[in-house]
Amino acid sequence: MTYIRKTHPLMKIVNNAFIDLPAPSNISSWWNFGSLLGICLILQILTGLFLAMHYASDTTTAFSSVTHICRDVNYGWIIRYMHANGASMFFICLFMHVGRGLYYGSYTFLETWNIGVILLFTVMATAFVGYVLPWGQMSFWGATVITNLLSAIPYIGTNLVEWIWGGFSVDKATLTRFFAFHFILPFIITALAMIHLLFLHDTGSNNPTGIPSDADKIPFHPYYTIKDIMGVLLLIFFLMLLVLFAPDLLGDPDNYTPANPLNTPPHIKPEWYFLFAYAILRSIPNKLGGVLALVLSILVLILMPLLHTSKQRSMMFRPFSQCLFWALVADLLTLTWIGGQPVEYPFVVIGQLASILYFLIILVLMPIISTIENNLLKW
């Protein structure tokens, strides 16, 4: 008897992607984050849909509609906080997923990696426009400051900013279009994630050793479905811990004040997951230079396959590269901390040093150390 999952046109696709998929027998828990990102995306789309049913994208009613969701809608508070903190969990999983790719050399799957970088940009754009929607002080000023960065583009900058704003300042038109973007982008992310998976299943998964595992494959189900369920339970546990015990831990108190164009908050800063890029932006005194550094801080990931000089794919057997990798992680944590600090001594200097170190490790030190390790192998 042939199973329906192997013959039905739709079931066959699901079967080949999640059930009978040949997977390496030695992939660790670092390979759980792909499925966790899928769960996060589904969770965000569902909670977002229910929030959109009650949200009003107008400058006069946006803030009060969010308040109304929290106070009057049945379980509105939990939906709102699951959505807000779900974004934080999404980015934690994203950073882990990208970090895993860097550590184990998964960037050698060019198509998968490049689609992944595009996905990262799209998720960041979605999170940014979403942060504007509650129309609190930090929403308004964050939108003003970040969109204003585009004015650094020569010749067309000012026109471009006014075009995005839909006027001469962040106003009703801006909020309405940001809501439209925030609604449509997750579906674009879903489509991109499917393409990401399509390219991954074309080559098969990488594994911690970086050695081809064609001779040693096991079916995805039940081995990795069980393993993924464990990850999902942990994700939901930590998410609900945040939502039920400290829902505002990662938010900004200023966002509980309605947006006021006449009153600037003392420290304008984005959500925690953008702080590393924000610190890089602030560390350069020139506006255009800062914007370029900001974009390059993420775009540099595209260059990873070109910067790979090692004869080994993974860092598993490369202790010097491992030291550099963890130095990079420490540097990113430092940048995240600096991004949330005021622009004054010593934070400015620390930010500048951390920014230089970030690009130095990725663009210079990693290729050099990899070459040294290649030569050490000859001894």
Curated annotation (Swiss-Prot):
<dbReference type="InterPro" id="IPR048259">
    <property type="entry name" value="Cytochrome_b_N_euk/bac"/>
</dbReference>
<comment type="subunit">
    <text>The cytochrome bc1 complex contains 11 subunits: 3 respiratory subunits (MT-CYB, CYC1 and UQCRFS1), 2 core proteins (UQCRC1 and UQCRC2) and 6 low-molecular weight proteins (UQCRH/QCR6, UQCRB/QCR7, UQCRQ/QCR8, UQCR10/QCR9, UQCR11/QCR10 and a cleavage product of UQCRFS1). This cytochrome bc1 complex then forms a dimer.</text>
</comment>
<keyword id="KW-0830">Ubiquinone</keyword>
<dbReference type="InterPro" id="IPR030689">
    <property type="entry name" value="Cytochrome_b"/>
</dbReference>
<dbReference type="GO" id="GO:0005743">
    <property type="term" value="C:mitochondrial inner membrane"/>
</dbReference>
<dbReference type="InterPro" id="IPR027387">
    <property type="entry name" value="Cytb/b6-like_sf"/>
</dbReference>
<dbReference type="GO" id="GO:0045275">
    <property type="term" value="C:respiratory chain complex III"/>
</dbReference>
<dbReference type="InterPro" id="IPR048260">
    <property type="entry name" value="Cytochrome_b_C_euk/bac"/>
</dbReference>
<feature type="transmembrane region" description="Helical">
    <location>
        <begin position="347"/>
        <end position="367"/>
    </location>
</feature>
<keyword id="KW-1133">Transmembrane helix</keyword>
<keyword id="KW-0813">Transport</keyword>
<keyword id="KW-0479">Metal-binding</keyword>
<comment type="similarity">
    <text>Belongs to the cytochrome b family.</text>
</comment>
<protein>
    <recommendedName>
        <fullName>Cytochrome b</fullName>
    </recommendedName>
</protein>
<dbReference type="GO" id="GO:0006122">
    <property type="term" value="P:mitochondrial electron transport, ubiquinol to cytochrome c"/>
</dbReference>
<keyword id="KW-0349">Heme</keyword>
<feature type="transmembrane region" description="Helical">
    <location>
        <begin position="320"/>
        <end position="340"/>
    </location>
</feature>
<feature type="binding site" description="axial binding residue">
    <location>
        <position position="182"/>
    </location>
    <ligand>
        <name>heme b b562</name>
    </ligand>
</feature>
<dbReference type="GO" id="GO:0046872">
    <property type="term" value="F:metal ion binding"/>
</dbReference>
<dbReference type="Pfam" id="PF00032">
    <property type="entry name" value="Cytochrom_B_C"/>
</dbReference>
<keyword id="KW-0999">Mitochondrion inner membrane</keyword>
<dbReference type="GO" id="GO:0008121">
    <property type="term" value="F:ubiquinol-cytochrome-c reductase activity"/>
</dbReference>
<keyword id="KW-0496">Mitochondrion</keyword>
<keyword id="KW-0812">Transmembrane</keyword>
<keyword id="KW-0472">Membrane</keyword>
<comment type="function">
    <text>Component of the ubiquinol-cytochrome c reductase complex (complex III or cytochrome b-c1 complex) that is part of the mitochondrial respiratory chain. The b-c1 complex mediates electron transfer from ubiquinol to cytochrome c. Contributes to the generation of a proton gradient across the mitochondrial membrane that is then used for ATP synthesis.</text>
</comment>
<feature type="binding site" description="axial binding residue">
    <location>
        <position position="196"/>
    </location>
    <ligand>
        <name>heme b b566</name>
    </ligand>
</feature>
<feature type="binding site">
    <location>
        <position position="201"/>
    </location>
    <ligand>
        <name>a ubiquinone</name>
    </ligand>
</feature>
<keyword id="KW-0679">Respiratory chain</keyword>
<feature type="binding site" description="axial binding residue">
    <location>
        <position position="97"/>
    </location>
    <ligand>
        <name>heme b b566</name>
    </ligand>
</feature>
<feature type="transmembrane region" description="Helical">
    <location>
        <begin position="288"/>
        <end position="308"/>
    </location>
</feature>
<dbReference type="Pfam" id="PF00033">
    <property type="entry name" value="Cytochrome_B"/>
</dbReference>
<feature type="binding site" description="axial binding residue">
    <location>
        <position position="83"/>
    </location>
    <ligand>
        <name>heme b b562</name>
    </ligand>
</feature>
<dbReference type="InterPro" id="IPR005798">
    <property type="entry name" value="Cyt_b/b6_C"/>
</dbReference>
<feature type="transmembrane region" description="Helical">
    <location>
        <begin position="226"/>
        <end position="246"/>
    </location>
</feature>
<feature type="transmembrane region" description="Helical">
    <location>
        <begin position="33"/>
        <end position="53"/>
    </location>
</feature>
<feature type="transmembrane region" description="Helical">
    <location>
        <begin position="113"/>
        <end position="133"/>
    </location>
</feature>
<keyword id="KW-0249">Electron transport</keyword>
<keyword id="KW-0408">Iron</keyword>
<dbReference type="InterPro" id="IPR005797">
    <property type="entry name" value="Cyt_b/b6_N"/>
</dbReference>
<feature type="transmembrane region" description="Helical">
    <location>
        <begin position="178"/>
        <end position="198"/>
    </location>
</feature>
<dbReference type="InterPro" id="IPR016174">
    <property type="entry name" value="Di-haem_cyt_TM"/>
</dbReference>
